[in-house]
Amino acid sequence: MVERVYINIMTNIKYGFQPLDAIMTHFSISNSDIVRASTEQLTHKMVQKGRKGCRLNPHIKQKIANALNAAQKEQVFTIRELFNY
């Protein structure tokens, strides 16, 4: 029972606003722009969770990075630059 509660707490950790949020604000890119630019399955909810700092798995982080790079051509961003966890 204690293990189950611990796992639940660990999966709900939020890391605060991520660098992704600041980058999207700087380039005036909305969540809808990211979803539209994505060639993979990506939802508004995934992007919003990424901006707010909810834990995402590495695959979703990569989808968001790919979509952000497709939405703007000025700079190429890596996962490490977009997320601080």
Where are these regions (language model features)?
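DNA major-groove recognition helix of helix-turn-helix/homeodomain DNA-binding modules
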Residues: 59-76
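Recognition helix of helix-turn-helix/homeodomain-like DNA-binding domains
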Residues: 40-56
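A short, Lys/Arg-rich alpha-helix, primarily the initiator
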Residues: 2-37
